[in-house]
Amino acid sequence: MPVFIVFLLCMFTYTCFAEDSSESGVTEQAQAVFSELLSSLEEETKEALSEIGIDDADYTQLLSLSPKRVVDAILELITGKMSEKLKAVGFVCALLVLSAVLDGFAQPGSTMHSVFSVFTTLLIVVSLLLPVSESLVQAFSAMELSSNFLLAYIPAFAGVISMSGKPLSSAAYSSAMIGLSNLLAQCNVKVFLPVVQVFFSLNIASSVQPKYAFNSLVAFFKKAVTVLLGFSATIFTGLLAIKGSLASAGDSVAVRGVKMLVGSAVPVVGSALSDAYTSVLGSITLIQSAVGIFGIVVFALMHVPVILDLLLWYLALSFTASVSEALGQKQAATLLNGIASTVSLVNTLVIFTAFILIISTGIMLNFKN
């Protein structure tokens, strides 16, 4: 009787096969991470991503990113922002030529000569204050947007790093970047913005009232800020590289230990399980690289348009300052050089922020088990 029951069970059994769902599981995890990151972006950044061919939460689009589309988008951006600067240059040059002609009818050092110089300087301030201020506001908005995006990006990227078998590297990255995010958010409002306002005011005051020569003070101030930012960037990236290197070494030892333990402790199928573990880690490492590259692209799209806009303003203001000096308009030249110096300082702040965010992500992508 027991033999007959066993025979019946064998007759009515079905053959089953294990489903290889590793690839689909990795794809679903990647889609979930990208969807979360995309939902935290502003509409302008999403449109910029769409212009370069990244319009869906699919890491395969990052692999097919076309350099030609990126270059075309940058050229289109420069062309669109060029018209405003050319109009400003034309208007300021016309004022300078008119002021130079009127100065020809006034005696050097006379009251009329001083009136013409002050009047020209004030007209330049009025004509440039609004467009330049809008560009400066956009620069601070870009830095604020990048700080807000970090709040969603840090947990996602750190989580993927931890899933890929590098929990120590994940902890090192998240601790450093959370501190950086809070520091940038506080500095944008309490340090950077007041510094730029004071810097801008001193430049205008030194041009309207030549007896208050703040040029040397402003130049020293700018140089000090630039050196401080460069020193801070070097220290931060160096510390992150050191912490990441040590954490990566510890993670590598842990992964090898797990593989050795599984291969030796589990009989018969130990080596197969060890290979499967390695395959899973490799798949998750692919997600880590995709998320890291996506973050670098987003940070670049947030900052590159602002950097190019400020660079165009700097070139336009420097050109008009050269024209002003050639026409003998010293006060106007001082004003234009001062505004150009302010724009250059803000651009330095934006480049510093972009450099820190992009390089820190690149450092973590460089460490492999």
How does the language model describe each region?
Residues 122-131, 150-167, 187-195, 204:
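Mid-bilayer segments of alpha-helical transmembrane spans in multi-pass integral membrane proteins
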Residues 327-347:
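Interfacial loop-to-transmembrane junctions
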Residues 115-126, 146-154, 183-189, 220-234, ...:
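Small-residue-enriched core segments of transmembrane alpha-helices in multipass membrane transport
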Residues 98, 102, 201, 205, ...:
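Alpha-helical membrane-inserting segments
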Residues 176-238:
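Loop-centered beta-sheet repeat module
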Residues 89, 93-97, 123, 127, ...:
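Residue-level signal for the membrane-embedded core of alpha-helical transmembrane segments
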Residues 289-330:
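Helical hairpin unit composed of two closely spaced alpha helices linked by a short loop
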Residues 2-5, 9-95, 100-117, 130-141, ...:
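Gly/Ser-rich, low-complexity
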